[in-house]
Amino acid sequence: TTVGGADTGYEWDHPALKQKYRGYKATLDTFDHNYNWHDAIHVPDTHHIDVGNPCGMDSQEPCDDQGHGTHTMGTMIGSEGDNQIGVAPDAQWCACRNMERGYGTPFTYIECFEWFLAPTDLNNENPDPLRAPHVINNSWGCPPTEGCNPDNFELMNIVVNNLRAAGIVVVVSAGNDGSGCGSVYTPAAIYDGSFSVGATRPNDTIVGFSSRGPVWVDGSNRLKPNVCAPGTGVRSS
């Protein structure tokens, strides 16, 4: 199973992630980022006064400019020998950076979704749908401050539906805007085609910050999230 991650980037050579990175060839101790990594960050985000990003723009290798992506990937597949911190330690991963230090746009989010449909080489050429991941994790939301609003919700919805039609499961965080009703309000958690996940405490109660349904923002009254899972005090990379 291959897990695709879309986030702030990933520290691919982290001890808990390196052996599971699809681009790493353990027998030769070499790596190939073609078809395994894409950077959708081409310009600095306007939320930041400074323009210095530790990963730069259009990074040719997996890089995490904030740390959030590395943590989420460890939660999914992290494993270092007997030190298995992920829930699917036998899976491998590929990735796309869709946020610049925690901020994205509809364009960066959609670009990563489209890349996962048919991953390309580092020149963004020769797309190959046979290298698409089986599931994509998205621990982010696109609020109005990033440019998502009811007028353009359908753009990302089309891409999510295309991924589902290709047999790819789109997993999305329900959001951290709880605890009121209707607080699942950002793409891609709001869509029928996404599998959105809320957060629980160790005692199986819902965490206060975890967003609740139903989805009111688009008038659908859709029941979300689909499931809940541990979301606090999670040991990861």
Q: What are these model-predicted stretches?
A:
Residues 116-151, 173-174:
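Short acidic, glycine-rich surface-loop motifs adjacent to enzyme active sites
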Residues 152-170:
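Catalytic-core regions built around general acid/base machinery
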Residues 6, 96-98, 138-141, 171-174, ...:
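Generic beta-strand/beta-sheet core signal
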Residues 1-108, 126-135, 164-167, 189-194, ...:
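Subtilisin-like serine protease catalytic core
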Residues 144-153, 173-192, 198-224, 235-237:
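Active-site-adjacent substrate-recognition loops and nearby beta-strands
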Residues 78, 115-118, 138, 229-233:
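Glycine-rich, acidic and aromatic/proline-enriched surface loops and short helix-turn segments
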Residues 107-117:
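Amphipathic, non-transmembrane alpha-helical secondary structure
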